[in-house]
UniProtKB/Swiss-Prot annotation:
Entry annotated with the keyword tRNA-binding: no
Binding site for ATP: 150-157
The protein's name in its UniProt record: ATP synthase subunit beta
Organism: Vibrio vulnificus (strain YJ016)
Subunit-level organization: F-type ATPases have 2 components, CF(1) - the catalytic core - and CF(0) - the membrane proton channel. CF(1) has five subunits: alpha(3), beta(3), gamma(1), delta(1), epsilon(1). CF(0) has three main subunits: a(1), b(2) and c(9-12). The alpha and beta chains form an alternating ring which encloses part of the gamma chain. CF(1) is attached to CF(0) by a central stalk formed by the gamma and epsilon chains, while a peripheral stalk is formed by the delta and b chains.
Family affiliation: Belongs to the ATPase alpha/beta chains family.
HAMAP family referenced in this protein's UniProt entry, alphabetically: ATP_synth_beta_bact
E.C. number(s) listed in UniProt: 7.1.2.2
Amino acid sequence: MATGKIVQIIGAVVDVEFPQSDVPSVYDALNVKDSKERLVLEVQQQLGGGVVRCIVMGSSDGLRRGVEVVNTGAPISVPVGTKTLGRIMNVLGDAIDERGEIGAEELYSIHRPAPSYEEQSNATELLETGVKVIDLICPFAKGGKIGLFGGAGVGKTVNMMELINNIALQHSGLSVFAGVGERTREGNDFYHEMQEAGVVNIEKPEESKVAMVYGQMNEPPGNRLRVALTGLTMAERFRDEGRDVLLFVDNIYRYTLAGTEVSALLGRMPSAVGYQPTLAEEMGVLQERITSTKQGSITSVQAVYVPADDLTDPSPATTFAHLDATVVLNRNIAAMGLYPAIDPLDSTSRQLDPLVVGQEHYDTARGVQQTLQRYKELKDIIAILGMDELSESDKQVVARARKIERFLTQPYHVAEVFTGDPGVYVPLKETLRGFKGLLAGEYDDIPEQAFMYCGTIDEAIENAKKL
C-alpha cells in the first residue's frame, strides 16, 4: 500500500503528495492515519508532481500537514445485501444507529457503470399510489423515475412520506432511503415511523424491509455528494438479485449543491447561476444508474427542491430530462389550503397514454385538465366583472372546476398527527368513478364544501348530507 502525506488543507479539499511511482487513481479511497475516527479521502484530481487533490468524507477539523495517508487502491466500498436492512448508515457504509457493525459479507464500490442498453428493460406496469391526483394526472410506472418538485415548505417531504407509507408498506419488496443533505430531525422521525409501521424490526433485523443511508445538512460537502451513490449502490445490489426495489432520495437538489461546493473548492470555473460546469454530467452519472434491468426493477421517487420556485433554474431543469413522471407542487394551491398542493396542470407523466392507462382513464384525466384550464382562463374575467357576466356554460365550468379542485385534496396518513383526520388510500377505480361523475355533471347539486378532504365520491355525498 502506497503512503503519502498531506501537504495542503483548504476546508473540505486536501492535497496529498505520493511518490511519483505510486500515484493513486481518480476515485481511489485514501485512509488517514492517526485520526481518532475513520477518515477517508476520495481522489478527485491529479495535479502532477505526485500530488493528488481529494475531497474529505468527513470533517477536516484537526487535520494537519504532514499526516500520513494510505492508498487503499480501490474506490469507496460499502456493505450491500440483506445485512443492511433495518440499519442506518453513513456515506462510507458505517452504522450510525449505535447497534453494532453491519457485518455484511460483501462490499460494492459506489462508482459503478450504468447497465448497458441490452440489459435495460421497459416499464409499462402501473404503480397505484392511493393518492387521487397522482393516480389520475401523473400515474407512476413500476420501474420508473418520479420527481417531486416544489419550493420550500410546499410539502415535498410529506408527499414523499405518504408515498413511502402507501407504496412501501403495501409493496412486499425492499426499499432504500437516501437522505441527501436534509434535516437530521426528518431522518430521525422517519426511522421511528418505520419502526412503528413494522418496516424496521429491531429485534429481527433480517425481517426489516428498508435500508437507510443518511448524509445530513450539517455534514461536509463530500458526504452529501456521495451519499446518493451509496444508497443507489445498495439498491442496485437488491435489483441484481432479481428483486423489485423502491429507492427514495430526499433531496436531489442537495446533491447538486454539494457538487457546486466541491467544484468551487477544486478550483473549477462556475457556469450558469454559479453551478458546477459538470452539472449535467454529474446528474447523468447518478440518474443513468437508476434504471430497471431484465433481472429486477428500481422504482425511484426523488424530491427536488426548486430554488425560489423557479423551475427554469439549471438544477431542477437538468433533473427534468431524466424523469418518467413529474409531480409539481404549487405554492398558490398550498396558499388556498388545498393539500396535497400538486398542480394538475403542471404535473406530467409518460404513462398518461391511452395505450398504457386505457382510453377511459386518459379521457377523464384530460377532461379534468381542460376544465381546470378553462377555469384558470376565466379567473381574470371573474376578478374584473364578477360571476354574473359569465355565460351559463362558463358558470357551469367554474362550478365543476371548483369541485374538482376540492376533490383533488385528500387526508394523508402521515399528516394524521397534525390534522386529526384519518388518512385515506383511494383505489384508482374509485378515483376514476368520482372524476368521471364530476365531469358528466352527476354531482352538480352537491355543494363544493362537501368535496374538501374526502377520499371517495361516496364520502363527498355523505358530507353533503351533514351540511
